Amino acid sequence: MISSFHRPTVARVNLQAIKENVASVQKHIPLGVKTYAVVKADAYGHGAVQVSKALLPQVDGYCVSNLDEALQLRQAGIDKEILILGVLLPNELELAVANAITVTIASLDWIALARLEKKECQGLKVHVKVDSGMGRIGLRSSKEVNLLIDSLKELGADVEGIFTHFATADEADDTKFNQQLQFFKKLIAGLEDKPRLVHASNSATSIWHSDTIFNAVRLGIVSYGLNPSGSNLSLPFPLQEALSLESSLVHVKMISAGDTVGYGATYTAKKSEYVGTVPIGYADGWTRNMQGFSVLVDGQFCEIIGRVSMDQLTIRLSKAYPLGTKVTLIGSNQQKNISTTDIANYRNTINYEVLCLLSDRIPRIY
């Protein structure tokens, strides 16, 4: 989708805030622990290349979801380690090796397929994924991991790391977390040749369970200034939300009692009132269920009335503001604030999703 620079809707990304957030977390983790910045999904909508470049002096490497995301960073000149967290099939190995990209291997079936396709792993750096209870990808026993490591070495791979992912590190009840932690520790203890890097700490684990950190962490949502738990747990130290979203009024009019607004005529005015149109809609990731939520105009909360359209939404105004008046959808406006978590709570979702849904049509300004 093309970025629409010729309309007033923009996302502003504060790279300094991201750097300071990472530094804040690093102050609370043990010395000598490696830091991976998680920049998958275009750095959670913030811009993977720009964020990665900003963090170059602070981090040891980067985590992405797939090979294309890794190649984007390499093509942008990022020369530190890049770990693909998802599964890369053997037919893409040559490209990974050629670009010095570290891959995740999560099953013995992968080895069988690599041998069937006569793939060698010479020069390939690998992290082995353990399923300690997340239930997605990974091996489930020391026996399987030992066999996988031996097989990878036979094929010429450098098995640098082993890792897992916690399902409930951002919840108050740590029962499941502790079960996973003990499972992972027991599996690691049963390895005949333990890889150099062992990591299990995502953002939530790094800030609320720092005593469980091994020798590397993966910092995702906290880097961007958001609470991994949404509103469930308090942050142990302050973070700065790095992304704000703003637009402008492009149309203002008065409607009368009985007039309707938007598709389905779901809003009917009870009295004469001013209505403003803002050029952002569900094609930008501002979803249809945001009807009834508010944005900020002139330091006042203004309700979204009528359904959110593909490209536009309408808000109730307290007066006839001039065209071009700033509208804040995420961020601060005259001492008032709307956070990404506020939006997530209204949508009954998580702050991660709100950010990741902001489409490429919205230009990012740094």
Curated annotation (Swiss-Prot):
Q: What is its EC number?
A: 5.1.1.1
Any one GO cellular component localisation term in the record: cytosol
Entry annotation: catalytic residues: 40, 263
What PROSITE patterns does the record point to? ALANINE_RACEMASE
| SUPFAM superfamilies tied to this protein | Alanine racemase C-terminal domain-like, PLP-binding barrel
State which pathway it belongs to: Amino-acid biosynthesis; D-alanine biosynthesis; D-alanine from L-alanine: step 1/1
Q: What Pfam families does this protein's entry cite?
A: Ala_racemase_C, Ala_racemase_N
Question: What cofactor is this protein dependent on?
Answer: pyridoxal 5'-phosphate
- Which domain of life does the protein's organism represent? Bacteria
Q: Which reaction does it catalyse?
A: L-alanine = D-alanine
Q: Which UniProt keywords apply?
A: Isomerase, Pyridoxal phosphate
Signal peptide position in this chain?
none
Positions binding substrate in this chain are 136, 310
Positions of modified residues (N6-(pyridoxal phosphate)lysine): 40
Classification via InterPro entries: Ala_racemase, Ala_racemase/Decarboxylase_C, Ala_racemase_C, Ala_racemase_N, Ala_racemase_pyridoxalP-BS, PLP-binding_barrel
Q: What is the top EC class of this enzyme, as a single word?
A: isomerase
In alphabetical order, the GO MF annotations are: alanine racemase activity; pyridoxal phosphate binding
Membership in a protein family: Belongs to the alanine racemase family.
Q: What job does this protein perform?
A: Catalyzes the interconversion of L-alanine and D-alanine. May also act on other amino acids.
Q: What is this protein called?
A: Alanine racemase
Q: Which organism is it from?
A: Streptococcus pyogenes serotype M2 (strain MGAS10270)
